[in-house]
């Protein structure tokens, strides 16, 4: 059975890594729909809502909304509460590219408010090398649904045996999360 053609939504000017990731996943970069931005360089919520409705009418499957915390070009933060509300209403995955702007969650006011609602995302990517001087290859992807994350990556082939203790001990193996 063929999978439906998917759509991923992100603001114009969002990081190019999204298109690259979709290429790696086999969806191709053509599934990206760039949404116009408002005067604060945030994804325009009316345009996003209209794009999702239009794509559904055309038989496409909205897969994800990619919010941005600190866009590379202008440092913009999307309205994460509005994105999360729409994602929940439409049953669409909400991811936040917080590679550059995750730090604001740790900051004092007024910078902390830039990332209000970011915790409602289904997943968040961050790169610590962009702020605290950590090595370039240090990054993380946080997934809100532990069970979904585990079931996606968990694999117990016959040659991997459980043990009472040690690295293979217990129910949770390091490899069960990717």
Enumerate the language-model features and the residues they cover.
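Short helix/loop capping segments that flank catalytic or ligand/cofactor-binding pockets
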Residues: 18-20, 31, 75, 103-104, ...
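Active-site-proximal loop/turn and secondary-structure-junction residues that shape catalytic pockets
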Residues: 14, 71, 98-102, 130
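Catalytic PLP-binding core of fold-type I/II PLP enzymes
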Residues: 76-108
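PLP-dependent aminotransferase-class I/II
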Residues: 1-67, 74-78, 82, 108-113
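Acidic/histidine-rich catalytic neighborhood
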Residues: 100-101, 106-123
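Active-site C-terminal subdomain of aminotransferase-like
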Residues: 71, 116-178
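Soluble FAD-dependent oxygen oxidases
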Residues: 62-74, 87, 92, 164, ...
């Amino acid at each position: 059975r063929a999978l439906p053609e998917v759509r991923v939504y992100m603001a114009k000017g969002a990081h190019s890594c999204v298109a690259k990731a979709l290429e790696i996943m086999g969806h191709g970069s053509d599934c990206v729909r760039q949404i116009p931005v408002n005067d604060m360089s945030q994804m325009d919520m009316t345009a996003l809502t209209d794009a999702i409705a239009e794509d559904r009418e055309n038989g496409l499957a909205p897969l994800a909304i990619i919010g941005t915390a600190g866009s590379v070009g202008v440092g913009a933060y999307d309205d994460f509460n509005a994105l999360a509300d729409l994602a929940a209403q439409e049953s669409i995955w909400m991811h936040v590219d917080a590679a550059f702007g995750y730090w604001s969650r740790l900051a004092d006011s007024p910078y902390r408010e830039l990332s209000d609602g970011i915790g409602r995302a289904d997943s968040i990517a961050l790169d610590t090398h962009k702020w605290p001087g950590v090595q370039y290859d240090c990054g993380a992807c946080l997934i809100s649904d532990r069970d979904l994350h585990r079931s996606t990556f968990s694999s117990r082939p016959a040659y991997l045996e459980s043990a009472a203790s040690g690295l293979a001990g217990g129910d949770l193996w390091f490899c069960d999360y990717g």
